[in-house]
Amino acid sequence: MCASQKNQELIGGLILFSAALLAIVVNNSPLASYYAMLETINVKLGIENLVIDKNLMHWINDGLMAIYFLYIGLEIKREIIVGTLSKPSNIITPAIAAFAGLAMPSLIYLSINHDIKVINGWAIPSATDIAFTLGILALLGTRVPAKLKLLVITIAIFDDIAAIAIIAIFYTKSLSLLSLSLGTLFILAMIICNRIFKINRSSVYVVLGFFAWFCTIKSGVHATLAGFTTALCIPFRENDKDSPANFMEDSLHPWIIYFILPVFAFANAGISFSGISFSILFEPITLGIIWGLFVGKQLGIFSILAVFKKLKWFKLGESFSNLQLYGISLLCGIGFTMSLFIGVLAFNDTHLLNAIKIGVVVGSVLSGFFGYIVLRFIVTNPS
């Protein structure tokens, strides 16, 4: 990662944090009525019977986040073809660690929450916010070696793949087979353009991807799946920055970290303290998310990394101390935007959403704070 990219990740992380803090301030000020307009102002897109009519909040969650998952898909495709995921030896341990980091928080959440009304939130503490995590890694600088950062990114990539699968499978509330079939046809059209006609114009994939996204929303499947699958259909050529995948990834990167994620954070992190008592911190759903992110994530990921290192099944891990592995395991508990995203898909009750937001913020802050402390002050020989 070059110096400019490190600066972008650091600045992006600070903007993301500031956007979330601003949302909380605005929603607990005289401007709260304007903040509420995110859910009351509707915007229509389409013609005649082919119309999507959603409020601003849904456009952010269904539209902007689809672009974010398009970017994630482009990153994953590059890593599979020429990056760390191109070597099987680099895949196994991070993949298992990511799975453990998904399973353990979910189990902790379910062990605390037995009410059928809140069980649907089991996936909320399973996510990792790679943007925030990279921001803290950038803040740590040389205290975190390049290979250790690469390990964090690889775990986060598998975490993102799991999140996409979870959203598609568990948070699809209704299904229109006609719209889904039409969306699939647009995906197939992109594959044909890429593999058969060898079309390298980015605009072709943008247009076809837009129609795939439109049909996916109409089908009831969450639009993020369209963003991800579109990315996998876009041509990638090694060492060619002008290939559509490389061009789109580079073009989207600043928009993702400086606009899309901060806007999402502002729209979804606005906890309203009106009518909320301190006891909300001790409600099962809040505790399940806090302990899932702060305890479950570190326990699941670190246990796999440490055991595999001890058994010499993890060659990359031999160059790291257990404290370093523990530090990055803590950082993976920063769920923030991804956890909030799953939360708004799982519930629409205002009280539950406030409990979710508090749980996500507290769990993420604890994970980020202690992860930073371990890697900055406790690890004695970072190199």
UniProtKB/Swiss-Prot annotation:
GO CC aspect terms: plasma membrane
InterPro entries the record matches: Na/H_antiporter_dom_sf, NhaA
Entry keyword Glycoprotein: no
Record key words, sorted: Antiport, Cell inner membrane, Cell membrane, Ion transport, Membrane, Sodium, Sodium transport, Transmembrane, Transmembrane helix, Transport
Gene3D superfamilies reported in the protein's UniProt record: Na+/H+ antiporter like domain
Compartment(s) of residence: Cell inner membrane
Catalytic activities: Na(+)(in) + 2 H(+)(out) = Na(+)(out) + 2 H(+)(in)
Transmembrane segments: 10-30, 56-76, 91-111, 121-141, 150-170, 174-194, 206-226, 254-274, 289-308, 327-347, 355-375
Coiled-coil blocks: none
Topology of this chain in the membrane: Multi-pass membrane protein
A UniProt-annotated Pfam family: Na_H_antiport_1
Keyword Membrane carried by entry: yes
GO biological process, one term: regulation of pH
MF (Gene Ontology): sodium:proton antiporter activity
Similarity annotation: Belongs to the NhaA Na(+)/H(+) (TC 2.A.33) antiporter family.
Alphabetized NCBIfam families for the sequence: NhaA (TIGR00773), PRK09560.1 (NF007111), PRK09561.1 (NF007112), PRK14854.1 (NF011427)
Role description: Na(+)/H(+) antiporter that extrudes sodium in exchange for external protons.
Protein name as it appears in the record: Na(+)/H(+) antiporter NhaA
